[in-house]
């Protein structure tokens, strides 16, 4: 070997060594070291909750949310899931008025119906009066409409959403309903697939530095209950809940004689650790929760 090195072919060894270097580089590219001055860390955390909730007690309990967060809102059918996120987006002091680009992907009710509900929520004008007050509606809606994007998206996948974020200006993504989003792969059980959907929703938030809000159903145990916690997420005892930063259950109490009584319960709150019940009311005609 020493006397006649040209006789030997070291190409495979060279390739092996180069590949080791490539693996190390790929490994490092997946990590982002945190090494900042303590003051800088605190100031960055204070900036983090730059998306404010327009329900005071909810804002106080969370200090707001921001890019990289994954929030789950869930309830029984007809309890006000869509009305809640519509109110967070389009009610006064909501996400849209704060200047956040809100993109809603609808795979349950027709998206045109959702859009009308957003308009009513913002303007305070019920659907049946929109035509006769159209000039007023247009003037008011123009104030926030460039921050509200609504899509009919029955067959959309998580890959589609990642691509969408890369190509558009996005602050907030709302997925109504998250459980119906398509993902790659085959799964032995429904709960395994749902866990992966929620895992990918969290990754969608972190990878694109956006706030992701997923809307989901509550299981039958939550029917007529005031306090709805994450143990009642439909078809998942742990997998869904494990991925979220904040989980808000909407309760509709059995003993209430008022159809508009609602309770919000923060059964998971990694933002501040505060778990509270919030009494509120649902305005069906304006899709507002206040």
Name each region found by the language model.
Residues 59, 74, 89-90, 103, ...:
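Generic hydrophobic alpha-helical scaffold/packing signal
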Residues 180, 189-224, 242-243:
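Conserved P-loop NTPase motor cores
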